[in-house]
């Protein structure tokens, strides 16, 4: 019988994490459970930095970006002795289960705890939208708004100067954020990690646009594909059009979460408590077709594939 739970945020922060923590805390308290907030992710779990939370601990948090519990990358958590100490800390406080909010790296920590017999529920918190088992992750739509606003501003200055602008978007090895922002921002060209990149093909496409009378263009590209400053120089040399590169960087992770992320985070937080009370452990929560779902966390990490939004790309191509 679950009586006490812990909640932590891990890995890169995303807007809506505070709303998810709030959802976990308020839903747990409504069921008579005690909740402990764990500071700075798995590092704080290992160092036994925890604090009991009440409903006032999460007051005025739903609208805040980031995570008030803090987050830290802690690769040492892969070590068996480190995890053993973390589990000992949980057991010493009488904590029966753990809710982990983060991306696939955070899920890996929850997976290892699950394999060692400690019940965990994972909530997908990342702007990258790269977690299997869910259509969308907490923070994706807020980051999308941030990127689209930046693209809109760049278009203003690009059109004024008849310039080509390259915008680098976060996402690691997932192009969802870039693709969605490119559609919403009306970008002329899209470069994604899921599609093999050939810079000469891109140059040819840009030249074709210029030949048709295009005065300016926006190229949206996911991070880690190439050096965008070098790409900008090459495009400028080949097209004779001024070309500038912009890296949006960590601004994409910040800001007050949009309404959808607040709702999604709240639903997922409450659903995590529902699963724990039903006796589930070792699960990860997702949303599919607007319904809450859960999957085996080990299966999600090892076997499930995140589908590429090919239909979105086809739509984008029609609108170039």
From Swiss-Prot:
Binding-site residues for ADP, renumbered to this chain: 22-26, 55-60, 155, 186-188, 212, 214-216
Protein task: Catalyzes the phosphorylation of D-fructose 6-phosphate to fructose 1,6-bisphosphate by ATP, the first committing step of glycolysis.
Domain of life of the source: Bacteria
Family note: Belongs to the phosphofructokinase type A (PFKA) family. ATP-dependent PFK group I subfamily. Prokaryotic clade 'B1' sub-subfamily.
Organism for this UniProt entry: Serratia proteamaculans (strain 568)
InterPro entries: ATP_PFK (IPR022953), ATP_PFK_prok-type (IPR012003), PFKA_ATP_prok (IPR012828), Phosphofructokinase_CS (IPR015912), Phosphofructokinase_dom (IPR000023), PKF_sf (IPR035966)
EC number: 2.7.1.11
Principal subcellular localization: cytoplasm
Subcellular location: Cytoplasm
Reactions the enzyme catalyzes: beta-D-fructose 6-phosphate + ATP = beta-D-fructose 1,6-bisphosphate + ADP + H(+)
SUPFAM superfamilies to which the protein is assigned, alphabetical: Phosphofructokinase (SSF53784)
Residue sites binding Mg(2+) per the record: 104
Enzyme category, top tier: transferase
Residues annotated as binding substrate: 126-128, 163, 170-172, 223, 244, 250-253
Positions of ATP binding: 12, 73-74, 103-106
Single GO molecular function: AMP binding
Subunit: Homotetramer.
CDD domains: Bacterial_PFK
Keyword terms: Allosteric enzyme, ATP-binding, Cytoplasm, Glycolysis, Kinase, Magnesium, Metal-binding, Nucleotide-binding, Transferase
Regulation: Allosterically activated by ADP and other diphosphonucleosides, and allosterically inhibited by phosphoenolpyruvate.
The protein's name: ATP-dependent 6-phosphofructokinase
Entry GO terms, CC: 6-phosphofructokinase complex
Cofactor(s) listed in the protein's UniProt record: Mg(2+)
GO terms of biological process kind: canonical glycolysis; fructose 1,6-bisphosphate metabolic process; fructose 6-phosphate metabolic process
Pathway membership: Carbohydrate degradation; glycolysis; D-glyceraldehyde 3-phosphate and glycerone phosphate from D-glucose: step 3/4
Entry annotated with the keyword Metal-binding: yes
């Amino acid at each position: 019988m679950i009586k006490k739970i812990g909640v932590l945020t891990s890995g890169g922060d995303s807007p809506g994490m505070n709303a998810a923590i709030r959802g976990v805390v308020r839903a747990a308290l409504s069921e008579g459970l005690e909740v402990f907030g764990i500071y700075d992710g798995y590092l704080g779990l290992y160092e036994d930095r925890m604090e009991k939370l009440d409903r006032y601990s999460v007051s005025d948090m739903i609208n805040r970006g980031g995570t008030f519990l803090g987050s830290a990358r802690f690769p040492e958590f892969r070590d068996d002795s480190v995890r053993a100490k973390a589990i000992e800390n949980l057991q010493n406080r009488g904590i029966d289960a753990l809710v982990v909010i983060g991306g696939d790296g955070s899920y890996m920590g929850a997976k290892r705890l699950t394999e060692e017999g400690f019940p965990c529920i994972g909530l997908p918190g990342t702007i990258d939208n790269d977690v299997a088992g869910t259509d969308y992750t907490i923070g994706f739509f807020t980051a999308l708004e941030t990127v689209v606003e930046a693209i809109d501003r760049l278009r203003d200055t690009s059109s004024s100067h008849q310039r080509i602008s390259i915008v680098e978007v976060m996402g690691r090895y997932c192009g969802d954020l870039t693709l969605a922002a490119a559609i919403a921002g009306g970008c002329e060209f899209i470069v994604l990690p899921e599609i093999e990149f050939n810079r000469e093909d891109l140059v040819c496409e840009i030249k074709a646009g210029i030949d048709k009378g295009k005065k300016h263009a926006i190229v949206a590209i996911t991070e880690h594909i190439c050096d965008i400053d070098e790409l900008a120089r090459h495009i400028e040399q080949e097209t004779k059009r001024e070309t500038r590169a912009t890296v949006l960087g960590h601004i994409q992770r910040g800001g007050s979460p949009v309404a959808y992320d607040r709702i999604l985070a709240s639903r997922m937080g409450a659903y995590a408590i529902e699963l724990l009370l039903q006796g589930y452990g070792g699960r990860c929560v997702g949303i599919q077709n607007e319904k809450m779902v859960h999957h085996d966390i080990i299966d999600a990490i090892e076997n499930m594939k995140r589908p590429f939004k090919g239909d979105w790309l086809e739509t984008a191509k029609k609108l170039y």
